């Protein structure tokens, strides 16, 4: 993000954030934010992605979990944010993981010396990076565990990892614990960024809390047709494979 973009961002958005945080003016703040809907110059996630893409002489790694009800626009929001930075649908698609084959390709690329600035895991349960291990057979669980173990190491070669899930519990605890940001996308378009911070209780003990810090608003966000069609084809194929396994008794 350029210096002039920073100035514009803070001059326009910070006063709105202030209105949202203070209960007496919260409604007014969201009404103003709605007027900036889909203006990705004021989108915090665009800034995260853009910062990960910047050339650095040191390694960085961060994780963002984006959660919300099915149909709230989580995946479309992330992909449009990435597209605003990369400006190329193919470059965005290469960084999106929909299934095990995508994850395998990612691991092979990293093995061959490539470094990824940003990677989006859409529904981590599809590649075994979720907490729903009880839903898998023993053989499948062992296979997924191998990929999981590999990912724990190769994440150091990815600057920014983004997960999209319906509920926070859908991400394995390992990733929930190290994710700096948790982003809730609501069906009414509100996007709330919370940061994990350490706070002291009255008894003097320390605990982690999620503090709302930044906000955004989306309205009818759509992902590019090429990515949407491929995503739906993959989901249909996986569904067909599951039905075939069930019919054959191999479950």
What are the functions of these language-model segments?
Residues 4-55:
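N-terminal pre-Walker A segment at the start of P-loop NTPase domains
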Residues 59-87:
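Glycine-rich phosphate-binding P-loop
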Residues 64, 162, 180-183:
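Hydrophobic/aromatic beta-strand patches that form the interior of the parallel beta-sheet core
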Residues 93-96, 167-176:
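Short, glycine/acidic-rich hinge or "gate" loops at secondary-structure transitions
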Residues 95-163:
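Conserved nucleotide-sensing/catalytic segment adjacent to the nucleotide-binding pocket
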Residues 163-168, 187:
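A short beta-strand-to-loop transition that corresponds to the Sensor-1 phosphate-sensing loop
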Residues 173-192:
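A short helix-turn-beta junction within AAA+ P-loop NTPase domains corresponding to the substrate/partner-engaging
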Residues 188-251:
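Phosphate-binding and hydrolysis-coupling loops of NTP-dependent motor/remodeling domains
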